[in-house]
Structures are given as C-alpha cells and as structure tokens.
Amino acid sequence: MVDSGTEARARGKAEAGLQDGISGPATARVNGKTQAEAVAEAELKTESVTQAKAGDGAMTRTHTVTYREAMAVTREVIKVEDTTKTRVMVETKTKPLAERSIVPQTKSKAMPMSRVSTVTKSEVKVVAVIEANIRSYAKSHDKANTGSRPDRREETSIGMKSSDEDEENICSWFWTGEEPSVGSWFWPEEETSLQVYKPLPKIQEKPKPTHKPTLTIKQKVIAWSRARYIVLVPVEGGEQSLPPEGNWTLVETLIETPLGIRPLTKIPPYHGPYYQTLAEIKKQIRQREKYGPNPKACHCKSRGFSLEPKEFDKLVALLKLTKDPFIHEIATMIMGISPAYPFTQDIIHDVGITVMIENLVNNPNVKEHPGALSMVDDSSESSEEPKSGESYIHQVCKGIISCPLNSPVQLAGLKLLGHLSIKFEDHYVITSYIPDFLTLLNKGSVKTKFYVLKVFSCLSKNHANTRELISAKVLSSLVAPFNKNESKANILNIIEIFENINFQFKTKAKLFTKEKFTKSELISIFQEAKQFGQKLQDLAEHSDPEVRDKVIRLILKL
C-alpha cells in the first residue's frame, strides 16, 4: 500500500515541470480491509500564457489555451483477503481544451507538455471511462455558456503566419493525426468549428491524354489510291462453296475508300471464299436508284449510273465473253462498286454504258477516226483560199514554235496567240498545234507555261475542243505541273481548264462516240484522271487561301 505522503511527493514533482503549473491536490485514501472509494473531480482552470519569440521578424498569433487539471481520487473496493496486495496506477495526462474567453498569446518556445503519473503496485490501467466523464462534464458546462461562443470564434480567427516548425509543434499539442480531438468536446458537429491545421492534399497529376493523329486529306487519298481490279468471273458448278443463288461472284471482296477498307460481301454460312452474286448487286443498284438523290436535281455533282434490267442483263452477258481487267473495272464503276475518278464517269455516260462495254469486247483494237470533233467540216478545209484570219494564226503559231525556247519573241507570240484564241471560230487552227504547245508546257519556264495555259484555258471554253483536251497527252501535261511547287498563277489556270472541261461534260454534250476512242486511249485517260484526282486532294491543303478555295470548289463540282 502507498500512503498519501508518497502520492503528494509524486504530484509535486510533476507540478515542477510546468511553467505556470497544473495545480490541484489529489488525495487517495486506501483502506486495507474496508471499502475504498475514489472520487474524481475535474476543475477547469484557464490561464493566459504569453510568450515572446526572440529574433527578427517575430510573428504573433492568438491562441486560446485551456488547461484542465484532473483531480483524481481513487476509490477502490477490495473484498478479498488481507494478504492480497493492491496496486493502483493512476496516470493523468493534461490535455489542452479550448476556452471561452480569448487571451492573446505570443509563442517563442515549445510549450512543455506535462504528465502527472502516479504509479503504484497495482496493474490497473486507466480506462476510457475517466476521459469520457471529463468530456461529458465539459460539454454540459459549454451549454450553459453558449452566449460567449460567437465572440470567441470571431477573435480566434485572427492570426498571423508562423514558421512550419512552430506550426507542427503547436499542432502536436492539440491533436494527433488529421482529425481534431478538441473541437468535438465543445460544440456540436453541425456547427462550424475553429480553424484547425490540416495537411495540404496531394495534387494528383492527371495522365496526359494520348494524342490521336488525325488523318489529313493527303493520307486519305493515299489509302484511296491503292486501287485494284475486281474481276467478275464464272464459278464452276461442281464447287461446294457455290452460293445458293446465281453463278457469278466477285473474286475480290474488299474495296478501299477514303473512309477505310470495308467488306463488300456477306460471310456465307458455309466454308469457302466470300461471295456477292450479281443478283445482290442488281438489287443494290435498284435500291440506290429508288432511294438515292435525283441526279437531275444538281448538275454540280457527278451523275450516278442507272441501269435498266435489260441493260444489266446485257452487261452481264458481255462480261462473260472476256476476262479483261480493264473492262471489268469499268463494269464495277457502273455497278457502283469501284469509285469513278473525275471525268471517267462522264466519259462512260457520254459514250453509253453498254455501248462502251460492247465496243471494247467486240472491237478492242479499233483505230481512232482521223477526224476530230473540233475540226470544221470539209467545206471549210477544201476552200481554195483560206481566210485571212486562218493564215495569220498559222503564221503566229509557226513563229512561236520556231523561236528559241523561253525567248522574248516566243513569249510575245504566245501572248498574242492568247488574245487571238478568244474567238471560237479560229480554234480549229490552234488545236492542230496542240502537240507543239505541250512541248513548251513541259520544258518551258514559268512565264512560258503561263501563256500556254492561257491559250488552253480559252480552248477549254469551246465545246468542240473538249475531245482534244481530254486526250491522254494533254491530261498528262496538265497534271504534271499541278503541284504545290508550281506558281500560284499557273495552278489557278489549270484549275480553270478543268472547271471548263467539267462544265462541258455536265452539259450532256456528245463528246465521245464508239468510233472516236480506242481501248488504249481510254486506259490512258482513266489513269491520268486518277492521278489528277490524287493531286487535287493534295492541293486541298495548299498554303494559299485562294488556291485552297478554288481546289475545294472544283472537288465539289466533280
């Protein structure tokens, strides 16, 4: 047993560690064989602690510090034998509690934290009941003094900045961790508590979004340009993979468009290659004709192919007679399977769908008629004395060809010929010198090309000259300088020439007949037209806004 003198000495040592002390007697009376009662009382004491911080830039802060000294009187009841030893250990920790009245405080040093520990031979630990009793007493005492709360909050919020080290020391006296352990003793949870220290939240860096490259028009054109021939071939009846209906299928099953590669046929329920019968293609053509836009409503768009049932059957019969890839490629354009590049669709329309296929199948090597639609009738050519205008134009054209390349005399002659070509009546004379002008266009300087293109621009306005300008040689020479490195004036002239050619096709004029073309010529024209379409897409990203606008307008017209 420990008497009251030992307990007083232990409490005295603890009080010496405090600056202003935590005072209060703690009396423990223990009777050996009788009942002992421990009565705990808590007294609230409020002290104002003002400390000064030495050094430059002293910072001040207002804090309310409340010390509650717990006076513990331990009462134990022991109903065991006299020989049993009792050990009582009472550990009292001073805990800072917020006070009603506000007293300014200047901090300089860390305020000491005192503990009063009374250790006896008993192993009884301090349970949470003592702390709960102190809290309940404090809450009941707060309800009686609610009137002073607003002033306390308003004054307490006034504070100055302190250093990080002092802030951490002060915070460690009032709470542990992130949640305050003081405020909940003095006010309900729904009320706003005093400002407490909370560590700054960690900023989580958001992952950078992955850049998805957008396909430019040029990249789409590259994917579009990888064309291949789709040949319609008969399938032998003995094969097990033959579709249930029809005996004609497509060997190639994928087509490439600006939007990517898409499957053309359906996957059959049986093993074998993919098939699309001509009956299905015919059905698709009927649907496009029924639900598609009216081709006569807008002349700026390319006309769609419309096949009558008789024409479709005739086309299929003609395809059975040949396996020529070029003829089958034209058939896929007509059926809407393959894309038709600029002017190719117009040429097919102009000649006639079945007429072109029939002529290519029956007479693949027919020679082009020596005459041209741009020439006048034989009466004008057989006249004994040519007109004065014709002779003069002949003289000018011969002078241009005979002059040195890019010479001032040649440039002057080309400029004069551009003015003479305004009249359509003399165009048949100029068109006879087109091969010589193409040489100047391919080898001449920028100025020479400019004046030659001016002459071609005037010729393209005449419906009778379109047949000569659409030839493979002319298209090849016009497409060659059609790039970003060419001068702006020359690019605009080439665009104007193709706009005029496109306009002549859209007027439904009969520019081609089955006697006026050969298979080799059509192949060359289609190849040059395809190359022109690709370069046209490249120029859609030209740096000059005027060129870019003209190119986009031409694309929409085609």
Swiss-Prot record:
Stored Gene3D superfamilies: Leucine-rich Repeat Variant
Coiled coil: none
Record key words, sorted: Repeat
InterPro entries per UniProt: ARM-like, ARM-rpt_dom, ARM-type_fold
Domain of life per record: Eukaryota
Family affiliation: Belongs to the eutherian X-chromosome-specific Armcx family.
Entries under PANTHER family matching the protein: ARMADILLO REPEAT-CONTAINING X-LINKED PROTEIN 5, PTHR47081
Listed name of the protein: Armadillo repeat-containing X-linked protein 5
Species per Swiss-Prot/TrEMBL record: Homo sapiens
